[in-house]
């Protein structure tokens, strides 16, 4: 419930800000709300713009949000092993050496992010390093490296941009029709009443459509997890990957949020699997056993 409430609150804030900004853009540019071509252009700009900016800033934002410390020069045997393992796996899949970081957290987790395959980040929690064997940790790293090699961050960004565009376009097209209908029925309210109707309806629809669209993006995220698991199995062997997932079943729920959670090794539980960024661990383990 906490995750769903946070999702709704975040989307509400984003949609309200978007509505205000887009209405200002309409006023400045003179584009009519009823112009479908103009609305589509604005929907594409805002729909893809936010996703692309988030992707480009993902490394810095991720490090700041978890308090991650980048390993510039390994200071101990664990950091040496971590750097060497990521470097070897990156060479195996043909990507540039990712930036490697460690963040302080009791949960066993790791995540990957970055705008390009050759300019990415792999971050590992202290809980994972302290509680997993080297074989298990190696499998987790292989999972994250596979996410990078598969281009999952870029693909997810493009998909989110398309989803955002449709959400914005459809909600505002419907809001425009509703405001036009009510303004004809209630001429006494004038332009102010029509604008408020448009603003309220578009905001509510953007929140509702955004929530429904999250089912699609979460499905895609779960789908990519199976591919990352399979990629890790190819790199280090499926027995190590299964052992890592078995270990995760004994750990606590992931503390990662947002896009980092989507590309972490372990996701959060939800009231329904449809709202989970990761498949249940049992399904992932069974899929690996069938390889």
From Swiss-Prot:
<feature type="transmembrane region" description="Helical">
    <location>
        <begin position="151"/>
        <end position="171"/>
    </location>
</feature>
<keyword id="KW-0378">Hydrolase</keyword>
<keyword id="KW-0812">Transmembrane</keyword>
<feature type="transmembrane region" description="Helical">
    <location>
        <begin position="36"/>
        <end position="56"/>
    </location>
</feature>
<feature type="active site">
    <location>
        <position position="144"/>
    </location>
</feature>
<feature type="transmembrane region" description="Helical">
    <location>
        <begin position="199"/>
        <end position="219"/>
    </location>
</feature>
<keyword id="KW-1133">Transmembrane helix</keyword>
<comment type="similarity">
    <text>Belongs to the peptidase M48B family.</text>
</comment>
<feature type="transmembrane region" description="Helical">
    <location>
        <begin position="4"/>
        <end position="24"/>
    </location>
</feature>
<keyword id="KW-1003">Cell membrane</keyword>
<keyword id="KW-0482">Metalloprotease</keyword>
<dbReference type="GO" id="GO:0004222">
    <property type="term" value="F:metalloendopeptidase activity"/>
</dbReference>
<dbReference type="GO" id="GO:0005886">
    <property type="term" value="C:plasma membrane"/>
</dbReference>
<keyword id="KW-0472">Membrane</keyword>
<feature type="binding site">
    <location>
        <position position="147"/>
    </location>
    <ligand>
        <name>Zn(2+)</name>
    </ligand>
</feature>
<feature type="binding site">
    <location>
        <position position="225"/>
    </location>
    <ligand>
        <name>Zn(2+)</name>
    </ligand>
</feature>
<dbReference type="InterPro" id="IPR022919">
    <property type="entry name" value="Pept_M48_protease_HtpX"/>
</dbReference>
<dbReference type="InterPro" id="IPR050083">
    <property type="entry name" value="HtpX_protease"/>
</dbReference>
<keyword id="KW-0346">Stress response</keyword>
<keyword id="KW-0645">Protease</keyword>
<dbReference type="InterPro" id="IPR001915">
    <property type="entry name" value="Peptidase_M48"/>
</dbReference>
<dbReference type="GO" id="GO:0006508">
    <property type="term" value="P:proteolysis"/>
</dbReference>
<dbReference type="GO" id="GO:0008270">
    <property type="term" value="F:zinc ion binding"/>
</dbReference>
<keyword id="KW-0997">Cell inner membrane</keyword>
<keyword id="KW-0862">Zinc</keyword>
<dbReference type="Pfam" id="PF01435">
    <property type="entry name" value="Peptidase_M48"/>
</dbReference>
<protein>
    <recommendedName>
        <fullName>Protease HtpX</fullName>
        <ecNumber>3.4.24.-</ecNumber>
    </recommendedName>
</protein>
<feature type="binding site">
    <location>
        <position position="143"/>
    </location>
    <ligand>
        <name>Zn(2+)</name>
    </ligand>
</feature>
<keyword id="KW-0479">Metal-binding</keyword>
